[in-house]
Amino acid sequence: MCAVQGFWHQACTATVSLPSKTLADNDPATIQAVGAAGTGASYWAVGDKIGIAVNGTFGGLTLNQTVYAFILGFNHNQSVEGNGIDFQFGKTADGRDIAFVQSYGSTGTGFCMNTTNTNSGGWKNSHMMKTICPAFLNALPAAWRNAIKNCTKYSDNSGGGSDNASYVTATTQKIFLLAEFEVHGTRYYANSAERNYQKQYDYYKNGNSKVKYQHSSTGSACIWWLRSVYATNAAYFCRVYTDGGAYSNIAYFSIGFAPGFKAA
């Protein structure tokens, strides 16, 4: 203790624990706090990955293994979506890009956008958003479920084959698919108004590969779903092809599932 102007003062010390600059060495609560503060880029880089134990059944796939989520961007589309660290599944431990597959190439089952061949109702009313994505969230550890923010995303939520700007509205969800513009940075098949509310993710803007491989057969490239409807077709949603290009696919086809989330 020391006396200052006649008063005795007790010296106090406090220990402050800073996040590790190695993403994988941090727990979900730390990543959440950094995301909420908007300071993720001070510690980590786009493309950094962290292993997450996925244990559950979603889209008919029962899985119990560690899959790596990687950083898509920091404070992505901040004026619409707020602070956070956006991630996508997935990668293998050695960094190979993968998507989940189940009954790959079949119809009406597995990772289909809808169980019948229609895009009516768009993203908001799709089987993918209403059933598969929540089931995937439930397959994540509780600590990660708590770290994931309800995220606002704009999409065509009507479908039906008309490129109508009024069809693009907001939804909130913890697990989402990426949109065509968020991956490619341009519009090919999606509603032409989606891009007015979206930004391309830095991970893809930086030139990283859009090709993904089947989680169960990592030598086999797979087509993977996007949440954007094919605006001028009543039965298709957008997808990324095995060469990384922009294409579309019938809604009840089972292809790759590569979900995203925001930690904040």
Task: Describe each model-derived feature in a short phrase.
Residues 2, 7-264:
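Collagenous Gly-X-Y triple-helix signature in extracellular proteins
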